Amino acid sequence: TTKNYGNGVCNSVNWCQCGNVWASCNLATGCAAWLCKLA
C-alpha cells in the first residue's frame, strides 16, 4: 500500500519520493512535510 503525504508517497518498502528526492519514511506518518515542500 502507499500513503500520500503532500507530493510524496510512502511505499511498502519505506521509501518516499518527493519530486526527484527520495528519503526513508514511515507508513504511519508518510513523508516528511518539509521534504515534500522543498522538492
From Swiss-Prot:
A GO cellular component entry from the record: extracellular region
Principal subcellular localization: secreted
A biological-process GO annotation: defense response to bacterium
Protein localization: Secreted
Secreted in keyword set: yes
Keyword vocabulary terms for this entry: Antibiotic, Antimicrobial, Bacteriocin, Secreted
Similarity section: Belongs to the bacteriocin class IIA/YGNGV family.
Record function comment: Bacteriocin active against the Gram-negative bacteria C.jejuni, Y.enterocolitica and Y.pseudotuberculosis, and the Gram-positive bacteria S.aureus, S.epidermidis, L.monocytogenes and Listeria spp. When added to the drinking water of chickens, causes a decrease in the levels of C.jejuni and S.enteritidis in the ceca, and in the levels of S.enteritidis in the liver and spleen.
Name under which the protein is recorded: Bacteriocin E50-52
UniProt organism field: Enterococcus faecium (Streptococcus faecium)
